[in-house]
Every structure is written in structure tokens, then in C-alpha cells.
């Protein structure tokens, strides 16, 4: 026998079961997607961090290489500068080279010293040219005098002496004689009278005449005159 009213009451009072939230089944697809996204972000962050580290290391290596290259270039530059300063210092006189001059003082001294030496070189060059011209003139004059002396000497004159001033203190003396004679005593007397004998030479002409050429220099204590010198030498030759 059915009781409809009882069934309606049962249905109206049937409890609804509510499970706790931690007992609900998880949505696998949603949870899986969230985990993948989290892992992707974590991997991306790690990759970026590693890339940043590599970039920092590369930048550090580049900076270190630049610093080493700069130091090497600086050492090479200083070595070249020191070599140049040594070359400059070598141009200075020995007295300046021994002094411990600073680099600015060395440069200043060289800048002043080079024009001085240039002027000195020019002066010496002019002096050399003057001396060469004077020597050339003297040589030519001596040749002319020797020729004139040889032409003027005849058989009746056994000795002939000619003297000529070369400078204020130097005298050239030519002696022509018909026989070989010792001039050592004559040279000794010249030394005693304040004359230094610079050189003595001899030659023989085609006429068998003997020629002596003396280059004399007067000292400060020389008291003999040229005429007295010639007469004294002639007297000595005649007595020899």
C-alpha cells in the first residue's frame, strides 16, 4: 500500500550532502596549465639570470683586456721617451751629461746648446777656409821664392839666405848653399835666441845646389830681429 504523502515528506527532508572543499576533485587541466606556466616563468628567469652573468663576465673580460693593453702601450711609450731623452742627453758636453738634469732641464739645455754648436761649426768652417787659402798662398809664394833664389844664385856665391814673415810670429827661412852642411849648431843658436824650430826640410836642385827650408816661430822672449837672424845664419854657414 502506497502512501504518497510519506514519500513527499521523505523527499522534502532528504539531506543534501556537501563535501568539504579539500574533498572536491581537482580540475586536472587547470592545475596542469598553472604548473606549466609557473615552470616556464622560472626557466625564463633562470635563463635571463645566466645570460646576465655571461654578459657581466664578458664585459669584465673586455675591460681587463683594455686595461692590460693600455698599460702595455704606456710602458712602451715611456720606454721610447726615455730612449729619446738619452739621445738628447748624449748631445750635451760631458760635464752636462754627468749632471743629474731633469727632463725639462735636459730639453732646455739641448735647445740652447744646438744653436751654439751650429754657430761654432760655422766659425770653424770659415777659419778652415781662411787657413787653406793662406796655406795655398804661402805655398805658391814659397815656390816663387825658391825659384827666384835658385835663379839668383850664381857660381860665385856659395851661400844665400832669404827670410819671409808668414804671420806676426812665424818666419820661413830658405837657405841655398853649394855644399852639405850641418845645421844643428845653427838650430841650437836659434833656440837660444827665442825661436822655436817647427820644421826643417832640404832639397837638391839640378845645379847641385842644396836648399834648406826652415819654419820658425818666435817666442815671447825672442829678442833677435830678422836682419840679425839672417846675418847670423850666414856667418854660421860661412864658418861651417
UniProtKB/Swiss-Prot annotation:
Residues 65-117 form the bHLH domain. InterPro entries: bHLH_dom (IPR011598), HLH_DNA-bd_sf (IPR036638), MASH1/Ascl1a-like (IPR015660). It comes from the Eukaryota. It is found in: Nucleus. Signal peptide: none annotated. Flowers. One of its GO terms (molecular function) is protein dimerization activity. GO terms for cellular component: RNA polymerase II transcription regulator complex. GO terms for biological process: cellular response to iron ion starvation; regulation of DNA-templated transcription; regulation of transcription by RNA polymerase II. Induction: Up regulated by iron deficiency in roots and leaves, as well as by nickel, high zinc or high copper treatments. Repressed by high iron, low copper and low zinc treatments. Keywords: DNA-binding, Nucleus, Transcription, Transcription regulation. Homodimer. This is Transcription factor bHLH101. It comes from Arabidopsis thaliana (Mouse-ear cress).
Amino acid at each position: 500500500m502506497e502512501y504518497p504523502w510519506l514519500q513527499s515528506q521523505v523527499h522534502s527532508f532528504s539531506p543534501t550532502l556537501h563535501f568539504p572543499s579539500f574533498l572536491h576533485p581537482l580540475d586536472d587541466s587547470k592545475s596542469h596549465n598553472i604548473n606549466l606556466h609557473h615552470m616556464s616563468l622560472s626557466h625564463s628567469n633562470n635563463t635571463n639570470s645566466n645570460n646576465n652573468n655571461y654578459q657581466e663576465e664578458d664585459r669584465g673580460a673586455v675591460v681587463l683586456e683594455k686595461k692590460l693593453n693600455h698599460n702595455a702601450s704606456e710602458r712602451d711609450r715611456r720606454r721610447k721617451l726615455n730612449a729619446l731623452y738619452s739621445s738628447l742627453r748624449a748631445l750635451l758636453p760631458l760635464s752636462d751629461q754627468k749632471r743629474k738634469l731633469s727632463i725639462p732641464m735636459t730639453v732646455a739645455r739641448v735647445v740652447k746648446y744646438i744653436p751654439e754648436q751650429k754657430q761654432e761649426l760655422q766659425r770653424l768652417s770659415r777659419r778652415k777656409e781662411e787657413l787653406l787659402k793662406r796655406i795655398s798662398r804661402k805655398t805658391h809664394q814659397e815656390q816663387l821664392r825658391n825659384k827666384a833664389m835658385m835663379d839668383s844664385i850664381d857660381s860665385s856665391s856659395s851661400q844665400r839666405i832669404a827670410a819671409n814673415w808668414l804671420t806676426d810670429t812665424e818666419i820661413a827661412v830658405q837657405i841655398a848653399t853649394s855644399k852639405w852642411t850641418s845645421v844643428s849648431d845653427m838650430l841650437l843658436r836659434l833656440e837660444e835666441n827665442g825661436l822655436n824650430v817647427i820644421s826643417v826640410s832640404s832639397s837638391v836642385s839640378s845645379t847641385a845646389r842644396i836648399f834648406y827650408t826652415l819654419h820658425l816661430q818666435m817666442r815671447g822672449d825672442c829678442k833677435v830681429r830678422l836682419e840679425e837672424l839672417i846675418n847670423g845664419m850666414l856667418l854660421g854657414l860661412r864658418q861651417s
